[in-house]
């Protein structure tokens, strides 16, 4: 337990980089508009400054200083546009979503994954054998995303990819590490910290995991914080050789520019140092379906004392080829992480975690009010607190079995907590989450 708690407190910063300044009272839309106009002004000034510099003495430090920042901005914009050319591939069809996203239907063999030298010129693998014990009988409704509610779909032979915009990259603290987690995180869990409420299993060999995750729209109070709920499949030590495969939903204003819960994936093979990324923002994950867009908003979402909705995620290792596959919802194979991406996960996982995480930047010196899950404590139960249900793992024989010896941990229980249980219908489950700042969590 102590080793996991220490890991959680020093884990590489999850799903959003934290900045030291906060703009809680400024709307994200206003920030984007003002910043966009500012950049246009900078470009104009740079042209004027460049012309002016030809008639100014080289010894004039004031004139030199005036042209320095515009040149830096121009270089940054050039770098952004070059990165966008790598990420955004030519589309055969484009779909506009009601949430402002643009979904590009990209030929399957031209998606970002195939820029990788070991995949270049290849095509996606055929679907693998499903784990024994898998059944679609409990899938009661068709999971959906906002973009698909338009009635439009991508044609056969293509995959839907959320288009990355210039504004997406301008929100990032580092253009070169856009779409990645930072390599170093402060160990002080009370400042710029990551707080968790998770269930986990360890001590065996794990070849996959499955769960239904309740979907909510928790409040995220700062652009530089996030709230997520996900599955982690982990291998290696919690140092430089950490391997992880991650999938779930997240609200991440910095990464996406809004507060919609979005389906996401992540991977790393070196503890988030130089490998891995979110979604399809680098060469790695290979998408194989035309119905689910990674990074797109999930619909519907749950409401307090109202309708409850969840997404079913299954991650498992193909015993024939060794790739790690991801299934979303009602039997939709999203794609796979190729085996060669990893070191330890080429064999198996050594730990599986399920649960929630938030970033706490301590605005104004107090705990954040960013919510986890539904924003309500676990004790409120169904319809009020968020849940994970039907927790399962995949064993060495490619068989889905119920999770056993599930341990639960909340590292800040006065802010976010967790309560586990079992039932005939839900199997192993837990409720988790909380409001963040409150009288017991100042």
Which residues does each predicted region cover?
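Exposed, interaction-prone regions of secreted/extracellular proteins
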Residues: 31-442
């Amino acid at each position: 337990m102590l080793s996991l708690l220490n890991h959680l407190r020093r884990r590489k910063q999850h799903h959003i980089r934290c900045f030291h300044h906060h703009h809680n009272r400024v709307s994200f839309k206003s920030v984007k508009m003002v910043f966009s106009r500012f950049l246009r002004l900078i470009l104009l000034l740079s042209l004027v400054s460049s012309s002016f510099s030809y008639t100014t003495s080289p010894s004039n430090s004031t004139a030199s200083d005036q042209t320095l920042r515009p040149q830096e901005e121009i270089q940054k914009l050039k770098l952004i546009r070059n990165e966008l050319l790598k990420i955004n591939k030519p589309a055969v069809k484009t779909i506009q979503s009601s949430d402002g996203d643009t979904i590009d239907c990209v030929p399957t063999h031209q998606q970002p994954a195939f820029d990788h030298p070991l995949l270049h010129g290849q095509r996606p693998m055929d679907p693998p054998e499903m784990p024994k014990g898998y059944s679609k009988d409990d899938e009661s409704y068709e999971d959906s995303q906002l973009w698909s509610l338009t009635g439009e779909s991508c044609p056969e032979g293509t995959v839907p990819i959320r288009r990355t915009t210039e504004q997406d990259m301008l929100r990032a603290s580092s253009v070169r590490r856009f779409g990645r987690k930072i390599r170093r995180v402060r160990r002080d869990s009370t400042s710029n910290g990551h707080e968790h409420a998770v269930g986990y299993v360890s001590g065996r060999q794990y070849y996959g995991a499955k769960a239904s995750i309740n979907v909510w729209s928790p409040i995220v109070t700062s652009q530089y914080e996030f709230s997520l709920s996900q599955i982690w499949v982990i291998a290696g030590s919690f140092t430089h050789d950490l391997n992880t495969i991650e999938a779930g939903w997240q609200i991440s204003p910095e990464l996406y520019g809004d507060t919609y819960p979005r389906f996401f994936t992540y991977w790393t093979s070196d503890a988030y140092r130089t490998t891995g990324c979110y979604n399809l923002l680098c060469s790695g994950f290979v998408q194989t379906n035309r119905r689910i867009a990674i990074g797109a908003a999930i619909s519907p979402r749950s409401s307090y004392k109202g309708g409850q909705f969840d997404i079913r995620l299954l991650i498992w290792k193909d015993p024939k080829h060794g790739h790690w596959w991801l299934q979303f919802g009602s039997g939709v194979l999203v794609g796979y992480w190729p085996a060669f991406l990893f070191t330890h996960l080429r064999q198996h996982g050594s730990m599986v975690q399920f649960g929630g995480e938030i970033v706490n930047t301590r605005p104004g010196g107090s705990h954040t009010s960013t919510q986890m899950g539904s924003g309500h404590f676990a004790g409120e139960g169904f319809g009020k607190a968020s849940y994970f249900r039907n927790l399962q793992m995949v064993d060495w024989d490619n068989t889905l079995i119920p999770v056993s010896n599930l341990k639960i941990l909340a590292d800040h229980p006065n802010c976010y907590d967790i309560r586990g249980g079992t039932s005939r219908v839900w199997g192993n489950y837990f409720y988790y989450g909380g409001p963040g700042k409150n009288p017991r969590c100042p």
